[in-house]
Each structure stands twice: as structure tokens, then as C-alpha cells.
Amino acid sequence: MSHQTGIKANAELLKFFGKCKDGKTRVLKVSIENEELRLVSHSDVKRDWEKDYDTLVRPLIEESTPCYILYRLDYKIPTGYAWLLMSWVPESATVRQKMLYASTKATLKLEFGSGHIKEELNATSKEETTLQGYQKHKVDFNTPAPLTSREEELAELRKTEVKTDFGIDTKQQTLGGINCPIADAVAQALHDMRRGGYNYLQFRIDLEEEKIHLVKADNIELTGLPAQIPTDHARYHLYIFKHHHEGNYLESVVFVYSMPGYSCSIRERMMYSSCKGPFSATIEKHGIQVAKKLEIDNGAELTEEFLHEELHPRKLNLRPQFSKPKGPPSRGAKRLTKPQAVE
């Protein structure tokens, strides 16, 4: 997503990035102003990192203004001290601000030095920006999420597969697909869609990074949906189809996997095909219930009639109807005949 915003650090910030790694700087605040990353303020190390945390971070957090906080921790890694990157994007921020900060974070990490950033925190409430909030985030991050009944069944199935001696474990375990990681902007867009911010999202897989990124988040009419489907690359799409069925108003979320024939490379086709199952599961983990999953090769297929038929297929009476066979044609009244006597 950093390639889409074009926002980069200004000269002052780049210069400070080189200086702040000398071990004396504890925290710095960076914001997006006038389409560039700017240094807002910074503070030096006072005490150990836990005692400095609330004292130095709290004054930097403004109620409704997003920013990035880079906080130096006290343990070292091969490149020097480890740093925490906090993205402060409050719920009250505008949709544009949320998108901008989510999609620019990769650029910030690159220009600061990704190797120095060992921990990340996305904060949307002031409680999450405190030391207690950070510690809770660490606990939650390291605790496995509870499994649904379906996930528990799959976990048990995998255990069974691993114990078999047929030599086909790898193949069986890959039948579920490849679980590609998602960019922060993807998670934010899913969160915003669940809250009613968008009715359409488009995603792409970075084949080199093997990561799913957000391409577009918008509100579009159904008539404009076909035009969103690329003709040269595969994509994933989420669309909220608003319609009526049997007198009820429905808002059904449709997951669309578009693959424009053989104009895509073999690797691209394989990646999108393998990742679609796990990615749709990730979408549902973010609170979006997918009503229908579709695969198309042409955007023209996405008409109102098509979506309605896919969501509510007509019930067909499969019982064969046989007409009662007609009786033989009438041959008049029956006649009784007496057997002739044998002479």
C-alpha cells in the first residue's frame, strides 16, 4: 500500500531517523502533514522503558488526531536497540485518515529501518496506548485465539493425518490452501466494512511478498461493480449486495474470486486459488459473515439477476411427473358368446 500513497519522510525526519538510533532517544512522534511524514516531537531516555512509557507516551496522544509513535525498548537485537511502532488511529478519525495511516505505515517502517522494529501495536482507544494496554496486547497476541467447532474438527483431522504412514501428509495438509498474511490496511478495511463504512473492498496478493494487500475500499452501486473487475490480474472482492427476497430486505456479503482466464501467470493462478479458502475464513474471523462465494472470469457476470439467483436459487421440483396412461380405445359393448357344442 505504500506504493499507492506516495507519502515519504521529509528531510528533517530522515536525518533524525539516523540520529535517534544512538541509544539516547526514547520516543518520537511522527504524523502525516501536507502529504509527507514529519517529525512532531521527541524525548530522550529518562529511566527504564517501563517507567518512561506512560510519562512520555501519554502527552503525545491527541484525542482525535492519528499519529505514529516509535518507542525505544531496552533490549538489544543485532541491529541495536529494539523499537516498538505504535499506530494511533482513534475510532473518531475520518475514513480517509484511517486509510492513509494504514497504507503509509509500510513506508515509515522502510525508511526508519524495518530491522529495528521488533514489535507493533495498533491502538484505537487511549487505554491501548498505556503501558497496561501494551502489556495486555502482548498477552493477547501470544495467546491462541479460541477455535470454532469447525476449526477444532479440522485440527483433529490434521492430527490424524500426521499420524498416518501413507506418505501423503503434505498433500493432505495443503488441501485446505495457503494462509497468506494480510496487511494492516486489509484488517482496517474489514473492520470499517463491518461498521458500515464501505460496501465494496478489493484485495490483491503480492506474489513476491506472498501477502494480501488492500487495493480499493469504496461505496459503489451494483451497476458499477462489473467495472471493478480487472481484465489482466486476479483479485479478491467483497461486496454487500442489498436486495429484497420474499418480502425481506437483505444485505448479503458476497466474496468474489476473479481470474481473467489464462492471461495471468501460472504462479498467480495457483496463489489465488490456494489462498482464497483461508482468506475467506480470515474475513469471517473479522466479523463479516460471507453469504456466498463466487468464482468468475468476467466482470460482466455480476448482474443483479446473477447475484440474486446465486444467493436464492429457485427450488426445482425434482419428482418426475408421469401422466396416467390412456386406456385402450373403446370397442363397443362386451358380448357374451356360448361355446359351441361338439358334435
Curated annotation (Swiss-Prot):
Cellular component, GO annotation: actin filament; cell cortex; cytoplasm; myofibril
InterPro entries registered for this protein in UniProt: ADF-H, ADF-H/Gelsolin-like_dom_sf, Twinfilin
GO biological process, one term: regulation of lamellipodium assembly
Compartment(s) of residence: Cytoplasm, Cytoskeleton; Cytoplasm, Cell cortex
UniProt keyword annotation of Cytoplasm present: yes
Keyword Cell inner membrane in record: no
Domain ADF-H: 4-139, 177-312
Recorded GO MF terms: actin filament binding; actin monomer binding
Pfam family, one: Cofilin_ADF
Keywords tagged on the record: Actin-binding, Cytoplasm, Cytoskeleton, Repeat
Region ranges (Disordered): 314-343
Oligomer and partners: Interacts with G-actin; ADP-actin form.
Physiological role: Actin-binding protein involved in motile and morphological processes. Inhibits actin polymerization, likely by sequestering G-actin.
Homology family: Belongs to the actin-binding proteins ADF family. Twinfilin subfamily.
Protein name: Twinfilin
Organism: Anopheles gambiae (African malaria mosquito)
